[in-house]
Design a protein with these regions (language model features):
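Short linear motifs embedded in intrinsically disordered, proline/glycine-rich low-complexity segments
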Residues: 1-152
């Protein structure tokens, strides 16, 4: 089975949306093996008005999520995920060999696949527990999905 991917037109629209909402990105962590959906991660560097990195998935929305019928009017079946990281977070390929720096990328990719694997959906207010810390350098062990407007 081929992975679900955006059409060229959809991908361009998602790239433009990411830049408009989060800022310009030059770095994209391209996924090499895509078992179900193709999930790249865009890295938006800190800026004058934003003292943090933002990582945004690009590909999760190629899969239409199984949103409950009573929410259909809100058009929530497609989404991407974002996470804010401190300005001193290491975001280079060398650092990503260490799980202490890579776990946010792994987390985004894992969450991006959840709706397809579990025939469900993710949206604002959902929580996803992990049961244990994401890496040895953090006590974080669960996710809360929030409206990205709160990043500022």
């Amino acid at each position: 089975m081929l992975p679900e991917v955006y059409s060229e037109e959809e991908r361009k629209a998602v790239e433009e949306h990411i830049e408009a909402c989060f800022g310009a990105f030059e770095t994209v962590l391209h996924e090499v093996v895509s078992p179900d959906i193709h999930v790249d991660v865009c890295v938006i560097p800190p800026a004058k008005d934003r003292n943090y990195y933002t990582l945004v998935t690009m590909g999760m929305g190629a899969h239409r999520m199984n949103v409950p019928a009573e929410l259909a009017e809100y058009k929530l079946e497609r989404a991407e995920l974002a996470i804010a990281l401190p300005a001193d977070w290491k975001v280079d390929q060398e650092a990503f060999r260490d799980e202490r720096w890579y776990w946010p990328v792994r987390l985004l990719k894992t969450l991006a696949r959840l709706p397809g694997e579990c025939h469900t959906w993710l949206g604002w207010g959902h929580t996803v527990p992990s049961g244990e810390p994401f890496a040895e350098n953090t006590r974080l062990c669960g996710m809360l999905l929030e409206n990205p407007v709160t990043f500022g």
